UniProtKB/Swiss-Prot annotation:
Disulfide-linked positions: 43-342
Biased composition (Acidic residues): 366-385
A GO CC annotation given for this chain: viral envelope
GO biological process, one term: fusion of virus membrane with host plasma membrane
Location of the protein in the cell: Virion membrane
Protein name as catalogued: Envelop protein OPG153
Organism lineage string: Viruses, Varidnaviria, Bamfordvirae, Nucleocytoviricota, Pokkesviricetes
Chief subcellular location: virion
Top-rank taxon, per record: Viruses
Residue span of region Disordered: 356-421
Length: 509
């Protein structure tokens, strides 16, 4: 048995037990999905995403003790990149040997250009990641390069490996014309890798990838990383850390980002501002999500037990109205979290909606929210003349609902797009939906500012105008489809300013 003092001083490593349960779940998932065809709208279910997530994290956690003379002078995470360490990884060895090596046997039969089923796709990408090898069988980093001081060489090798994992997923998506299959590229493969460079090298150099309808989640993943660097210094609002691998964020963090990088909301999270964050952790029984809210800066600790694979989610919404509204859609509820129904997945700003919050529940109480009713008994015995000065009256706080810092400031509202009578019906319906989503978002924002009557009046004016154009659109559809009884629906005067849109004054738009 190792000496306890040596263990304390780190001389003898504490051996991590292999999480065989995640390997068993992975094997069952592969068997279950091996013959499931990948079609245009096929995606990986929430349960299966979390199984994949656990496998990659358990593989990382089981890395062997690193030799002092076999560490990268550049700080590269060689324990997950080289055969020297991966072949010593007990989780990796257990995975390859599990069930008489059946998973490894299946993996060896796969070719990226022949994969057509969900189980094949998952097994191929996951085994490429945990084996530390590129599609052509070459290692990410050769063992002889572990101690190399050649920064350009090491960075280029890691960038190639990171890019190839993503390129391989896009290649399969393009061949099958699939929208939502997605695994990502783990955090350690982004060592000194510029997300913007990866994004442009993949999409600018491959004409076939220009169709953003193919591989939507992959595109969203790479686009986000292209506009948000890994180490943001003074701009960072959040920092995730897992096994020494850190990543900072200044925007809301959608589930496809945390899942694709391998982070979890149960990791160490540091918060650098007093802006509120909503940490989504699981689904609930109302077809919504449960979240924990944190306002104070410092270490964020989710104290809830980790939910089961079919319920667990990973996403963080920043409530920060000083941020760039250009990227506010990353925090929209239905983009933030990957829907379990494939056809409902929203991955772009164009389709993003921020509705359904009434189905969600806050499940925690921060220390500042707790009112201490337990008075000190000694205070009751104090002499009334002990304090010669009366207790000062505190400055008044804004009236509810103003529970957070800076809530007296007006929110930034999204601009409402003008209706366009020239567009086709389908385009105008899409535009109406976009306007509704924008108004709904603005209404949610102004809901926190009950005293902002100017903004509320403006929003009411927009809503009334939208109602008029809804009637106008109904008139045109009725006439073009001959599904109308006379007289046509009447476009009433605007309830606030008494106006009628010009297109409501004639029979034809």
């Amino acid at each position: 048995m190792a000496n306890i003092i040596n263990l304390w001083n780190g001389i003898v490593p504490m051996v991590q037990d292999v999480n065989v349960a995640s390997i068993t779940a992975f094997k069952s998932m592969i068997d279950e999905t091996w013959d499931k065809k990948i079609e245009a709208n096929t995606c990986i279910s929430r349960k299966h995403r979390n199984i994949i997530h656990e496998v990659i994290r358990d593989f990382m956690k089981a890395y062997p003790k690193m030799d002092e003379n076999r560490k990268s002078p550049l700080g590269a995470p060689m324990q997950w990149l080289t055969q020297y360490y991966i072949l010593k990884n007990e989780y990796h060895k257990t995975m390859l040997a599990y069930d008489d090596g059946s998973l490894n046997t299946k993996f060896k039969t796969l070719n990226i250009y022949m994969i057509t089923n969900v189980g094949q796709y998952i097994l191929y990408i996951v085994f490429c990641i945990i084996s530390g090898k590129n599609h052509d069988g070459t290692p990410y980093i050769y063992d002889s390069e572990i101690t190399s001081n050649d920064k350009n060489l090491i960075n280029d090798r890691i960038k190639y490996a990171c890019k190839q994992i993503l390129h391989g997923q896009l290649t399969m998506a393009l061949r099958i014309r699939n929208k939502f299959m997605f695994i990502g590229s783990p955090m350690y493969l982004w060592f000194n890798v510029n997300g913007s460079h990866v994004y442009h090298e993949i999409y600018d150099r491959n004409v076939g990838f220009h169709n953003k309808e193919i591989g939507r989640l992959l595109y969203a993943f790479m686009y986000y990383l292209s506009i948000s660097g890994r180490f943001l210094n003074d701009l960072a609002l959040l920092k995730f850390t897992y096994l020494g691998e850190s990543w900072t964020f200044s925007l809301s963090v959608p589930e496809y980002i945390l899942y694709g990088l391998g982070y979890s909301v149960f990791d160490t999270i540091e918060k650098f501002s007093n802006d509120a964050i909503l940490v989504y952790i699981r689904t609930n029984n109302r077809n919504g999500y449960d979240y924990a809210e944190f306002n104070k800066k410092g270490i964020v600790k989710v104290t809830e037990d980790k939910p089961d694979n079919d319920k667990r989610i990973h996403a963080i919404r920043l409530i920060n109205y000083s941020s760039d509204v250009q990227h506010i859609h990353f925090g929209f509820r239905n983009t933030l979290i990957i829907d379990n129904e494939c056809t409902n997945i929203q991955s772009s700003a164009e389709n993003a909606t921020d509705i359904g919050h009434y189905q969600d529940s806050k499940i925690n109480i921060e220390d500042d929210d707790i009112i201490d009713d337990d008075d000190d008994d000694d205070d009751d015995d104090d002499d009334d003349d002990y304090n010669p000065k009366p207790t000062p009256i505190p400055d008044p706080h804004p009236r509810p609902p103003f529970p957070r810092h800076d809530y007296h400031k007006r929110p930034k509202l999204l601009p409402v797009e003008e209706p366009d009578p020239v567009k086709k019906d389908a385009d105008r319906i899409r535009l109406d939906n976009h306007i509704l989503n924008t108004l709904d978002h603005n209404l949610n924002s102004i809901g926190h500012y009950c005293c902002d009557t100017v903004a509320v009046d403006r929003l009411e004016h927009h809503i009334e105008t939208l109602g008029q154009y809804t009637v106008i659109l109904a008139r045109k559809i009725n006439m073009q489809t001959l599904l109308f009884p006379w007289p046509l629906p009447t476009v009433h005067q605007h309830a606030i300013d008494g106006s009628i849109p010009p297109h409501g004054r004639s029979t034809i738009l």
